[in-house]
Every structure is written in structure tokens, then in C-alpha cells.
Amino acid sequence: MRSMTKGRPHTKIKTTTGGINMTNTYNDVPEVERETADGIRTVSLLTDALTGRKVFLFGNIDESLVFSFTMQMLNLMEDEQSEINIYINSPGGEVNAGLAIYDLIQSCRAPINMYCVGMAASMGAVIFAGGQKGRRFILPHSKVMIHEPLIPLGVGGSVSSVKNTADLMMQTRQELNEILAKHTGKNIEEVNRATEYNNYMDAKEAVAFGICDWVTDDLM
């Protein structure tokens, strides 16, 4: 039985939402033996998890993660009746990459359970909040962090180009905050205030804010 606590932009520049550095590598995933019609086979636990309709969003959100996630989801989305479990542990990353993942999740007709395992920060929090209502779960000691997008390092040039970058960043901020408002039930003014700083929330606070629905200790 699941243990739960109920709580109540599109730009041309590569924008990031900040966050700590994590690499997207699963080279150390162990293998297990499985009995098949052709005999005993050794398979990666990631392959085994995908067979069980489990997908992982771990690490920095970038183009490589989008590619991996899209390939897995397109395979699973062919079955619109069976649940998909998505586990997220991400410090954030590139906005455009994150919005691609967000859009893919929104387009999925299959029921999706979303689990925050450790951290959903920055763009990761936007993706997590965009999970299906009533199916967004967070572990008791996991954290969520929301904030404004960050200007990419090295941005410079003429006054006009800097102004153009600033305008694009404001559009991105508005787009991300509108997504958060849509999925949390907060009005846009509340979200604007909440994202003015690195706003860290524990599991219960994330439920209260509307980013997720349940605190759980059951990942199945």
C-alpha cells in the first residue's frame, strides 16, 4: 500500500536555469540475468526497467538527455492504456531541452506517474510540476527548487544585442512561470514572487505549493 500525505518561451539562445553540475552517464548500471524463451540472457537494469515501463530523468537536462528520453517515451507511448513511471532527479539545465521534455510528457495519452527522487530543481522542477494531476509523487526527503532562468555565461556584445538577450530572457521567464502557474494552481503574480530567488522547498512545502500531489515512500 502506498503511504501518502495529501496537500492541497521559446528563444533562439541557449538559456539555462542554472543548477549544480551532474553528468548524464549510466555506464555503471549493473546487469541482471533474465530467463527468456531463448534461455538465460544478461540485460542491463536500464533495459529491464524500460521493459517494466520505467523511465529515468537523471542528471543535467540537455540535448543528450532529451534524445534518450524521447526514444524511450515514444516506444512506451504506443500503449496508451498502461502506466508509465518517470523518476526525476535533476539539478536543471537548458530551457529549450527542458521544454522539449515537458511537451513530450504533455502529449502522452498513457497515464504517467512522476516521482521526484532526490531533487527536482530549476528546469527539473518545471518538468516535475507538469506531470499529470494526482500522479506527481515526492519522496519524504527530496527537495524542489524554483527560480528565474539565468543569463548564459559569456553573453556580451553591443548594447542592442545585450538588450535583445535581456528581452528574450524576460520572455522565457514569463513562459516558464505561466507553466508553473498552470500546473500549481497559483496565479502568475504568486509564481513571479516565488521565483525571484532560489526557492527551495521540502517535500511537504512542494505539495503545499502545488508542484506535486503526494509525499510517498513507495516508488512502485
Task: Identify what each model region corresponds to.
Residues 2-220:
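Terminal-region recognition feature
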